[in-house]
């Protein structure tokens, strides 16, 4: 079975059209509260000194801010002149369809421009998954299943195209970074990883997994080159934001501040996880005492460290093969969402692409991916409630139902962990690869 490239291009274009159509329907308040004001601030005053001017709100790394500024600039230089031209035609040509002007002047238009980078990142992510799947299996049906499941995933579309969040930007860079490690293009991989970290800090959780890959697959010379190159990438991307009075360490100190300063202190910031299950979804700080001096924050951090260490130990024993990399990232990111405090509803998204890639090992994992997509989509909807649907809204506010789906998702984690530990040896992998679907 050959993959028809023209058909692939058709579906990619179709997924883009779908995303831009969805993006025009609505958007979350973050665009008005943060993204647009940041972009306007940059266009008015320039990049230099941005973090000092917006010290209380600016919690995104520079690459995303650059995207916001470019998107707003395109809105002003491309959209507004066309809008003025259409308005002129509407005023001076009696037969001109005025409804076209109303559509063009939709209040969501500027938000659609701001969502542009996220929308294209969705496609970049899907193509990265397609390339990795091609390394994992020769089964074209599985490869296409993975591609189409990424292109038309409702949770990803909801997050990027409707909500307007940027989580797929760092995720796309991460996926391609993993791909280039196994294509032995190590310096390209480190650049992409750095660009992902400079988009949003959420992929930082996989750094321990990447560190083992770095140690095994990079030669001594490449390790030195990669370290220097990483420092250069951070320095260059932060450079436009540096003011004259900033020192040479501005990029690294600012990023460290962004990674540690901001964030809620809630047990669960609307995430359907163990803390949401045990405690009320009300805003409860994670600093209260559970036992002695043990707080939920300390306990969750200990659990995350123990889980990550155990996964890394098995990962190392399994010789760091690509399949084990996918397993490890799936487990580390899913556990972080389910058991750490201060998680937002969006923080399960990094798990979905890697859980989807497990389908290239055995198609049974695809059903777990479908459930995780359903679970994540409901969690996103519960936090926003748009577009309004009383039945779905009532489901997401029903404690019994929500507790049930949380328990199922936690059980899914342990199912995947079980297969990772017991069945993910080299022999079992080779025997089980996509055996349920034949070319």
Per-region residue spans from a language model:
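Start-transfer (signal-anchor) and selected internal transmembrane alpha helices
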Residues: 1-21, 26, 134-135, 143-145, ...
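Aromatic/glycine/proline-enriched transmembrane-helix motif characteristic
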Residues: 15, 135, 247, 259-338, ...
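Transmembrane helical bundles and short interhelical boundary loops of multi-pass, membrane-embedded
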Residues: 23, 243, 252-263, 267, ...
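Extracytosolic helix-loop segments that constitute the early lumenal/periplasmic catalytic or substrate-binding loops
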Residues: 33-66, 70-87, 246-256
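Membrane-interface alpha helices of multi-pass inner-membrane proteins
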Residues: 147, 157-158, 174-180, 187-212, ...
């Amino acid at each position: 079975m050959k993959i028809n490239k023209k058909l692939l291009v058709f579906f990619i274009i179709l997924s883009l059209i779908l995303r831009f159509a969805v993006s025009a329907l609505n958007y979350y308040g973050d665009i008005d509260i943060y993204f647009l004001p940041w972009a306007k601030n940059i266009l008015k005053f320039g990049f230099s000194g941005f973090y000092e001017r917006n010290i209380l709100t600016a919690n995104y790394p520079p690459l995303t801010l650059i995207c916001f500024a470019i998107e707003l600039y395109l809105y002003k230089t491309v959209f507004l002149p066309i809008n003025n031209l259409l308005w002129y035609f509407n005023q001076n040509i009696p037969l001109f369809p005025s409804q076209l002007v109303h559509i063009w002047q939709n209040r969501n238009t500027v938000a659609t421009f701001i969502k542009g980078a996220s929308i294209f990142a969705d496609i970049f992510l899907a193509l990265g998954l397609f390339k990795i799947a091609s390394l994992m299996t020769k089964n074209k049906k599985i490869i296409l299943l993975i591609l189409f499941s990424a292109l038309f995933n409702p949770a990803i579309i909801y997050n990027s195209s409707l909500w307007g969040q940027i989580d797929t930007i760092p995720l796309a860079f991460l996926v391609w970074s993993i791909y280039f490690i196994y294509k032995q293009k190590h310096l390209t991989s480190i650049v992409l990883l750095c660009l992902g970290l400079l988009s949003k800090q959420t992929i930082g959780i996989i750094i321990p997994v990447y560190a083992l890959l770095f140690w095994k697959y990079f030669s001594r010379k490449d390790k030195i080159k990669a370290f220097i190159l990483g420092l250069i990438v951070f320095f260059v991307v932060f450079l436009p934001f540096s003011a004259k009075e900033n020192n040479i360490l501005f990029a690294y100190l600012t990023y460290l501040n962004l990674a540690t300063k901001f964030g809620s202190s809630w047990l669960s910031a609307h995430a359907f996880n163990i803390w949401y299950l045990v405690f009320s979804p009300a805003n409860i700080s994670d600093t209260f005492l559970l036992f002695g001096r043990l707080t939920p924050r300390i306990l969750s951090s200990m659990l995350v460290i123990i889980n990550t260490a155990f996964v890394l130990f098995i990962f190392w024993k399994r010789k760091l093969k690509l399949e084990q990399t996918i397993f490890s990232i799936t487990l580390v990111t899913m556990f972080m969402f389910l058991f750490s405090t201060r998680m937002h509803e969006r923080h399960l998204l990094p798990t979905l692409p890697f859980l989807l890639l497990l389908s290239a090992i055995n198609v049974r994992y695809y059903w777990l991916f479908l459930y995780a997509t359903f679970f994540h989509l409901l969690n996103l909807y519960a936090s926003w409630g748009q577009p309004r649907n009383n039945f779905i809204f009532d489901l997401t506010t029903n404690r019994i139902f929500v507790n049930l789906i949380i328990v199922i998702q936690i059980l899914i984690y342990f199912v995947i962990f079980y297969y990772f530990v017991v069945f993910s040896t080299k022999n079992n992998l080779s025997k089980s690869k996509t055996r349920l679907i034949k070319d």
